[in-house]
Regions:
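Membrane interfacial helix-start motif at the N-side
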Residues: 11-42, 57-67
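Membrane-interface loop-to-helix entry segments
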Residues: 23-29, 69-72, 121, 128
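Transmembrane helix-loop junctions and nearby membrane-interface residues
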Residues: 41-45, 69, 84, 112, ...
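Helix-adjacent hinge/juxtasegments
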Residues: 47-85
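Transmembrane alpha-helical segments that form the membrane-embedded catalytic/substrate-channel core
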Residues: 57-68, 72, 97-114, 131-134
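Hydrophobic transmembrane alpha-helices
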Residues: 76, 80, 90-104
């Protein structure tokens, strides 16, 4: 069994298909929007399931970096709060989800490379980490 990648390795691989300035800008906007929309959909579907999946995601991030896990927990708390403040339902979250994915694919068309998650599904969680690491200036060295 191959050793799992550390945060620096994941981010280096993610960066390979996120170099074009417009693609990066679209990802800065769309990745958090997708994350938020998924949380909104899950919370509206089943709050208990949303809690369990949120904890699993936090554990994934904690395995990579304690600082990253803290940053992502803060973002998730903001997402949860916004979802609870907004009217219940699915339409808003589906609209955000679809529009943000369109933005992602436009960015990758500009980049000329396929989205990373086609290579490994875990990149769906690395995208938000990429935004958080840059936004908060988190260190990415191996533990």
């Amino acid at each position: 069994m191959a050793a799992s990648k550390n945060l620096a390795q994941w981010l280096a691989e993610y960066n390979e298909s996120h170099r074009h300035p417009q693609n990066k800008a679209l990802h800065w906007l769309c990745v958090p929007a997708i994350f938020f929309s998924i949380m909104g959909l899950l919370i509206n579907l089943n709050a208990a399931l949303a809690v369990v999946l949120t904890l699993a995601v936090v554990l994934f991030y904690r395995r990579l970096s304690a600082a990253l896990a803290v940053a992502m927990v803060l973002f998730m708390v903001v997402c949860w709060a916004l979802v609870w403040l907004l009217p219940p339902g699915y339409a808003l979250y589906w609209a955000i989800f679809v529009l943000a994915w369109i933005g992602q694919f436009v960015g990758h068309k500009l980049e000329g490379k396929k989205p990373s998650f086609f290579q490994d599904i875990q990149f769906l969680l690395i995208g938000p980490a990429w935004v958080a690491v840059t936004l908060f200036g988190l260190k990415t060295e191996a533990r």
